Structure formats: C-alpha cells, structure tokens
Amino acid sequence: LPPGSCRAFWGWLNAVFNKVDHERIQAVGPDRAASEWLLRCGALVRFQGSPRWQQDYNGLPTGPLGKYKIEAINATDSCIMYRGFDYLDGLEHVRDIKLEKCMYIQDECLQRLSETNNLQKSLQQLKIISCGNVTDRGILALHKLTNLEYLYLSDLPGIREKETTFRVLQQALPKLELELDLE
C-alpha cells in the first residue's frame, strides 16, 4: 500500500462506522441503536442498574426493546465523530460521558452534544481528556448543558484563553464543579 493509504482507509472505515442508520433507531429503539454505534466505534456503555461496562458488541443484552437504557458512555480511544451524534438524540438517561483520546472529537461535537435536548436534561458529569481538536469554542458551547454538575478537563492544548473561557462557563453554570488539569 502506498504511504497514507492506510490512514485514508481507516478514515473511511471510521466514517462508515459513524453513519447513522435512522431505520435501525426506529426498529430497535434509541438506546440499543446508540449502544451498537458506540461499541462499533470502540466505546463502552453502561446501562441503568448495572455496574458493568459493556464492551462486546456481540454481548449486548437482548430482551424487550426499551429495557436497557444507557446511563454512561466511556469513549476512550474510540472513533466516534460528529457524523454519528444523531444517535445521541433519543437517549434520555445518560448521566456520565467520558471523552478521552478521541481524535475525531472537535468543537462541533461538543456543540452538538450541548444542543441535544435530552442530554441537557440528563447529563451530570462530563470528562474531556487529551482531545487535541477541542478549543475554547467547544468548551464554551457546553454552557447549554444546564444540569451539568461536574466537568473535568485535562490535556487540551487547543484551549488558549483558559481564564476567560472558564469564567464565562462558571457564570453560565454557577452550580458546576470545574476540575482542571491543563498546562
């Protein structure tokens, strides 16, 4: 293979993994469809009432549609990207999201996350770590997550105006506990 073609192939494959299948969402419900998307992309999900992280696509629980509700998402080292974020729209019980070393997460993803009505109501904890494409703009977009109680930010070199960004965010979300580990 010529140099760069492997990267192009993986980029194409990741885009395929992130393509939203609206018929699938209708057929199996938002939580099952989102679980399939997240696991396909290398993320983990935890369902309500379960202490265990689900990581095996083939091990997804079966049962009545709507029985398993996603409560937490750990997207460490996953290939989730903006293109797949429509899967998040129908999720009503997600309280905790961790985005760590997600090379495709960028400001538009955080903006999309914060504009998702159900997440505005349910999301309480968000951790963003080592996502090199995130800038101040993406962090400022999080102000719409009005129920967010805890935000952890670490190793985000794209954040340049730290003091201003965090002051604006704290004013918008006065109950937010903000933990920073930034250079």
Task: Set out the residue ranges of the language-model regions.
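C-terminal regulatory domains involved in ligand/effector binding and gene-expression control
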Residues: 2-6
